[in-house]
């Protein structure tokens, strides 16, 4: 099974959307295998968003992601990266389809509720950056027999 990294951002945490977001992810068949509620240290934020360093929005992004707690998680399932990206919706909430997390809850590009790895390579890098192997559970849910052929 494929794993991916998701992070419920400060705007969603402050709006009490953690449970709703996790529920949507689980209802789609993805399994939560790691999760932690945390204040993001500056160093971790800079490593996570290193690809954006030097861009006009970088400082604001780092400031935002370290401003309040986030809920970081690892989810697992068949095509987890693609499935989670579809549930999340377009990066810009004004372009996200209704029924997606960002389409329903996102306010603008800077307050877009959730981060999701954009590729299997990014997912592997981000999972390793945010979680140790001991923080990720390896288990089987009874529903898996009903979800996958």
From Swiss-Prot:
Question: Which InterPro entries does the entry mention?
Answer: NDK-like_dom, NDK-like_dom_sf, Nucleoside_diP_kinase
Catalytic positions? 115 (pros-phosphohistidine intermediate)
Cofactor requirements of the protein: Mg(2+)
Catalytic reaction equation(s):
a 2'-deoxyribonucleoside 5'-diphosphate + ATP = a 2'-deoxyribonucleoside 5'-triphosphate + ADP; a ribonucleoside 5'-diphosphate + ATP = a ribonucleoside 5'-triphosphate + ADP
Detail which positions bind ATP: 9, 57, 85, 91, 102, 112
Alphabetical UniProt keywords: ATP-binding, Cytoplasm, Kinase, Magnesium, Metal-binding, Nucleotide metabolism, Nucleotide-binding, Phosphoprotein, Transferase
Quick one: where is this thing mainly located? cytoplasm
GO biological process, alphabetically ordered = CTP biosynthetic process; GTP biosynthetic process; UTP biosynthetic process
Which PROSITE patterns does this entry report, sorted A to Z? NDPK_LIKE
GO molecular function of the protein, one example? nucleoside diphosphate kinase activity
Enzyme Commission designation: 2.7.4.6
Q: Write down the superkingdom of origin.
A: Bacteria
Family matches, as SMART domains: NDK
Q: Name one GO cellular component term.
A: cytoplasm
Where in or outside the cell is it found?
Cytoplasm
Major enzyme class? transferase
Q: What is known about its subunit structure?
A: Homotetramer.
Family to which the UniProt record says this protein belongs: Belongs to the NDK family.
Briefly state the protein's biological role.
Answer: Major role in the synthesis of nucleoside triphosphates other than ATP. The ATP gamma phosphate is transferred to the NDP beta phosphate via a ping-pong mechanism, using a phosphorylated active-site intermediate.
Which protein is depicted?
Nucleoside diphosphate kinase
Biological source species: Staphylococcus epidermidis (strain ATCC 35984 / DSM 28319 / BCRC 17069 / CCUG 31568 / BM 3577 / RP62A)
Originating gene: ndk
């Amino acid at each position: 099974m494929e794993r991916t990294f998701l992070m419920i951002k400060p705007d969603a945490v402050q709006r009490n959307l953690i449970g709703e977001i996790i529920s949507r992810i689980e209802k789609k068949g993805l399994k939560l295998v790691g999760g932690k509620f945390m204040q993001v240290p500056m160093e971790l934020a800079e490593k996570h968003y290193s690809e954006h360093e030097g861009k006009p929005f970088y400082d604001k992004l780092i400031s935002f992601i370290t401003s309040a707690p986030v809920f970081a998680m690892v989810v697992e399932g068949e095509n987890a990266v693609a499935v989670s990206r579809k549930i999340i919706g377009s990066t810009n909430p004004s372009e996200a389809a209704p029924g997606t997390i960002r389409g329903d809850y996102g306010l603008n590009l800077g307050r877009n509720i959730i981060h999701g790895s954009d590729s299997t390579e990014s997912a592997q890098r981000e999972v390793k950056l945010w979680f140790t192997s001991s923080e990720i559970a390896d288990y089987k849910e009874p529903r898996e027999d009903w979800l996958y052929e």
